[in-house]
């Protein structure tokens, strides 16, 4: 539901500025320039720091290359998908293009540090040979004081300087890649969040918040690591492998041939392992998403769980998800263990073979001790590079698996495009017409909500939609806000179909207050001014009037910090009535031409409800339209017209409250009588209101 609230105004834009400014993220003018955070252009508040809890993602549209799908699928591709990851790998490197010069600098530093490392075996071999030669010479004929044409002091001084250069290059490489990786993660997360906020309600309704959080956090980190740190390690392994192989060939081509006999088995094992680990990685990330989803649900519903004593059941449910993650992790551990154990055995066998052949060559005089020592060290470097390349490939496959999940969301085009269409100049003084509207929710296609529904709401009316649960009252609001498109028919403002409007700008002209307002973690003032245009937010008198219209003044006076009181996550530190009044204050401050109230006064006391009703009546006098969805008599009687919906979403009667209540057998009277009967049996049983909506 919070996604819908964001979309009513500048929410997606605000979120991107809060999450990370795109211009700063994509800029590479300075490597150490962190992603910037735009400040809200509102003088009265601290920049927003909202925690957006989104309904998660699993729906995949058939849309390809901008063509609209007629049958969107409801699930992302299977976690066990065996499709090639090379396309995803290519996209990984395309994604890192803005950081290419820093990655290139890091690779140059790798070349420097690797060159220093690869010089060590040659130096050690030379020292060993010189030491063995000096044993057979007298002091006068000794040449052991000369190393590569330098005296010992000069040589070791130069060697120390080279080692320092190598250390600085290695440290610089690590710093650059860490910073580059963080920038890449920030860019990827911002794009993914933008893609999530642009999705249609059908997509969001059928998917899990935990899965989305997993894509934003762990998946994005894995992807960034695979094209920064992992590429660095792979490059280092390649350099060591080529240099090591070259030096081995220079020292002894016979021993090199012995070493290379074992290379093909290592390559084959690495290829098989990489493919296996990619699929396991994707399964693991999907399972982690499911685990996060369960944890998010349980933490949000803690009070309900405790009220019904469901702690043990929920712990078992969470433990089941933990076991799923554990079993996949176990498979990954066993696969990795078998691979590295096998390659280790192959490597040790190779080293033993080299020692056997090498010692025989020393005995025959075709190789010195120093040369064999250097060869063995280069063999270790070359073997390590093979292991490094195997690890590089497996990590790259992990990145491909995570990238597939992230790109899957980024590539998904919403069925309802939020930025296409003409700008609606104004909705004031325009009738709202539901013309032959038929609708079923995409997630429940067999359950008909509306069939040939016809409603006309005149400008300046306060219309109240009533009816039994499931009659489609709240669906009217969802269709007006175009969370969903109708199956047939049209919804028009004046003579213009709302599908022709730029959706994002259209929603900014409508006020919307839900039964259970979802407040952001911040101050009360932050929430009242959420998405309010700066020119309105700067008017202190207008803010005070809006607070008074929603009857917030009294309870705000009881808070020591007043408007600067923190509301907590999802408004947890406020009562239901206080949250509704804050949401109403936001709506009154915006003062839209069309205001939709979905059970927006259900938690208010009678005094607050009367104050709100009087201010809604003033909207009618000014020619503004209000649409209320309600069950309570106190709300219904203040409307100028009542629309009674039947069980199958049809209009069974319409008229003023006084006219309908005066008809003894009217549907409105029947609904109220049923409510009174329920009160006589122990209280009003209102299914729409009795369920705690912990969404």
UniProtKB/Swiss-Prot annotation:
Detail which positions bind ATP: 467-474
Q: What is this protein called?
A: ATP-dependent permease MDL1, mitochondrial
Anything else of interest in the record?
Present with 1040 molecules/cell in log phase SD medium.
Taxonomy of origin reads:
Eukaryota, Fungi, Dikarya, Ascomycota, Saccharomycotina
Q: Please list the GO terms describing molecular function.
A: ABC-type oligopeptide transporter activity; ATP binding; ATP hydrolysis activity
Organelle transit peptide residues: 1-100
Topology relative to the membrane, per the entry?
Answer: Multi-pass membrane protein
Role according to the record = Mediates export of peptides with molecular masses of 2100 to 600 daltons generated upon proteolysis of mitochondrial inner membrane proteins.
Gene Ontology CC, one term: mitochondrial inner membrane
| TM segment ranges | 103-123, 156-176, 242-262, 337-357, 372-392
Tell me the gene name: MDL1
